[in-house]
UniProtKB/Swiss-Prot annotation:
Disulfide bonds: none annotated. The keyword Iron-sulfur applies. One of its GO terms (molecular function) is 4 iron, 4 sulfur cluster binding. Its cofactor is [4Fe-4S] cluster. The lineage of its organism: Bacteria, Bacillati, Bacillota, Clostridia, Eubacteriales. Signal peptide: none annotated. Residues 295-566 form the Radical SAM core domain. [4Fe-4S] cluster binds at residues 309, 313, 316. Belongs to the UPF0313 family. This is UPF0313 protein CLB_0243. Keywords: 4Fe-4S, Iron, Iron-sulfur, Metal-binding, S-adenosyl-L-methionine. The keyword Iron applies. Residues 598-645 are annotated as: Disordered. Binds 1 [4Fe-4S] cluster. The cluster is coordinated with 3 cysteines and an exchangeable S-adenosyl-L-methionine.
Length: 645
């Protein structure tokens, strides 16, 4: 364990630090991991740097009010988050089945946090300390700050500020706003008077004094009229910029949810300061007996080089959380962290990742953003690269080269998503070549998501021909460097716009790939994304065009089965789908057929016979030659959800 002290979690810790009353208490749905990949750790350490005392209540028993009283009543208030992932996404699959594991909990076991954790925790805190201010933040609060469609309820819910009775919501990355809010509280301002901090959302009864704002359709309108919902989302989508974004107001009965414009992005110096704070860089020792916290394994020897993403994938809500503007750390800051890792006793020579939401977006998309902000009606890389886009991997490549030269570093991997279209726009192949030569371990994971151009257009992804060109170039480079490395594509079924015809088109593409992909995921309608708005309304809010939505559970199962057509258990669904789509030409023994005429006999196999677990039956399928790909790529669905680019 680290020599750095963890933040206090008990009265005994308070005594050791001679603290009578904490300034703030963070209540979180994750186990306590003091690592900069965890929001609780960052906010706690930032407040500590500002001279505040901070305690942590991690995963309290929501059925026991005493758990919320264990550190006493804080001087300034409680800070509440659900953890690194929305609690509903953490608990349920895309088909609404309960998950049985939780990589952010002791021993990887589920059951340590409630559904809708932010709401539950806030209600319990109000019960324990009626007049104590509550500030909510993190992904769950950020993406639910307005009235929003909730997939699990299949209805439009109010702003989480209304349901939680919290006093203030900090959205996005919270370092700047939490410092401003905490200092205002220290200076004596009441929580209900803090209304002018950027990056915050609050509830107001009277907006007559508010200036320069846009009022979006009310909760009552968006919960009963899908066109109004799409209109509200479009305005929200366009105004999430710190330079040109306006204050947004949404009425909820007799009150108003008010979102101040976003905070300016952190400067490089500010980013360096945040990641240089004294983190223990591991989980609290209280979890050791339970097997630790599995989530630390992915991040312990990974380096966050930047935040933000201008890829604007429709199914990703990052625009609403980290924003489109890249905020990067200096090379010196990153190299210091890499050197520090090599001195950790369990470092084996491998740095698992140097990246961010999209690894090869290391700098701002263009110079225009610095003065005017992000473009309101245009995207940086979709449908094609903007003429102002700066396409350059030189700085990122120089950083990777420097890390490779650090003593005791054997290998530096890139596991964050690589945006392959941006890679293809670069006329200089130097980065692409060194990526293949030094930074992948036998396979590169990329996210084409689909190959039907009509679906890709709705996803905000590049066209199929861009991906095909990338695939060819990838294998050409591997041939030149005498390596036989694979590509592992992330694929998605049932996204808005995907009908059976599109799913079959994707299945035919998979057939030509020669193996059955493991990285397949049903579209998951999570709060805050453009695709979720399409899913709920049947409308593309940016174009106002109608969109086909595969909501029927049988069809969704068919679409997923088509993506793994060679698995024995999927035979009946695939056959039914092909017949329904009048594609009987794909049933038979021909080279282009997906399945044979008759369902093959399923042989019994021993449970430990890993070679035959999937029961692949297609003689024309080359999957078995590449079975090592799928075996190496079995990851939990939460990590898949996070890393799709």
């Amino acid at each position: 364990m680290s020599n750095i002290d963890f933040l206090p979690i008990s009265k005994e810790d308070l005594k050791k630090r001679n603290i009578d009353v904490l300034d703030f208490i963070i209540v979180t749905g994750d186990a306590y991991v003091d690592h900069p990949s965890f929001g609780t750790a960052i906010i706690g350490r930032v407040l500590e740097r500002e001279g505040f005392t901070v305690g942590i209540i991690a995963q309290p028993n929501w059925n026991n009010i005493e758990d919320f009283k264990k550190l006493g009543k804080p001087k300034y208030g409680f800070l509440v988050n659900s953890g690194n992932i929305d609690s509903m996404v953490n608990h349920y699959t895309a088909s609404k089945k309960k998950r049985h594991d939780d990589f952010y909990s002791p021993g990887g076991k589920s059951g340590y946090r409630p559904d809708r954790a932010v709401i539950v925790y806030c209600n319990k805190i109000k019960e324990a300390f009626k007049d104590s201010p509550i500030i909510i933040g993190g992904i769950e609060a950020s993406l639910r700050r307005f009235a929003h469609y909730d997939y699990w309820d299949n209805s439009v819910r109010r702003s989480i500020l209304e349901d939680s009775s919290a006093d203030l919501l900090i959205y996005g990355m919270g370092e700047k706003p939490i410092v401003q809010v905490s200092n205002l509280l220290r200076y004596g301002m009441k929580i209900d008077s803090i209304k002018n901090v950027r990056g915050t959302t609050y509830i107001e009864k009277d907006i007559s004094s508010l200036k320069d704002y846009i009022e979006i359709p009310s909760f009552e309108e968006v919960s009963t009229n899908k066109k109004s919902y799409a209109e509200a989302y479009k305005i929200q989508y366009y105004e999430q910029d710190s330079i040109r974004g306006k204050t947004l107001v949404q009425k909820h009965k007799e009150r108003y949810v008010v979102q101040n414009p976003p905070q300016p992005p952190l400067s490089q110096e500010e980013m360096d300061e945040v990641y240089a704070l004294p983190y223990a860089r591991t989980y609290h020792p209280m979890y050791e007996a339970e097997g630790g916290i599995p989530a630390i394994k992915e991040v312990k020897f990974s380096i966050t080089s930047h935040r933000g993403c201008y890829g604007s994938c429709s199914f990703c809500a990052l625009t609403f959380h980290q924003g489109r503007v890249i905020q990067n750390r200096s090379q010196d800051s990153i190299l210091k962290e890499a050197n520090m890792m090599t001195n950790m006793k369990d470092f084996k020579g491998y740095i698992h990742d140097v990246g961010g939401p999209t690894a090869n977006f290391r700098h701002r998309a263009c110079k225009v953003q610095e003065k005017h902000g992000t473009c309101k009606n245009k995207q940086c890389v979709f449908p094609k690269a903007c003429k102002n886009l700066i396409v350059d991997h030189k700085e990122y490549l120089s950083l990777l080269r420097k890390i490779r030269k650090i003593p005791n570093v054997k290998k530096v991997f890139i596991r964050s998503g690589i945006r392959f279209d941006y890679l293809m726009y670069d006329k200089n192949d130097e980065f692409f070549k060194e990526l293949c030569e030094h930074h992948i371990s036998g396979q590169l994971k990329v996210a084409p998501e689909h190959i039907s151009d009509k679906v890709l257009n709705l996803m905000g992804k590049p066209t199929r021909n861009v991906y095909d060109s990338f695939v060819k170039k990838y294998y050409d480079i591997n041939k030149k460097i005498h390596k036989n490395q694979f590509l592992v594509p992330y694929l998605m079924s049932s996204h808005p716009g995907s009908d059976l015809k599109a799913a079959i088109e994707l299945a035919q593409y998979i057939k030509k790939m020669g193996y059955t992909p493991e990285q397949v995921q049903d579209f998951y309608p999570t709060p805050g994304s453009l695709s979720t708005t399409m899913y709920y309304t049947g409308i593309n809010p940016l174009t106002e065009e109608k969109v086909y939505i595969p909501k029927d559970q049988k069809e969704k199962r068919m679409q997923r089965a088509l993506l793994q057509f060679s698995i024995h258990d999927n035979y009946d669904l695939v056959k039914e789908a092909l017949i329904k789509a009048h594609r009987e030409d794909l049933i038979g023994n021909g080279p282009d057929c997906l399945i044979p005429y008759n369902k093959p006999y399923k042989k019994s196999h021993k449970k430990n016979n890993a070679k035959n677990n999937n029961n692949h039956y297609n003689k024309n399928n080359n999957y078995n030659k590449n079975k090592d790909i799928s075996k190496k790529n079995k990851k939990n669905s939460l990590s898949k959800h996070k890393k799709r680019k």
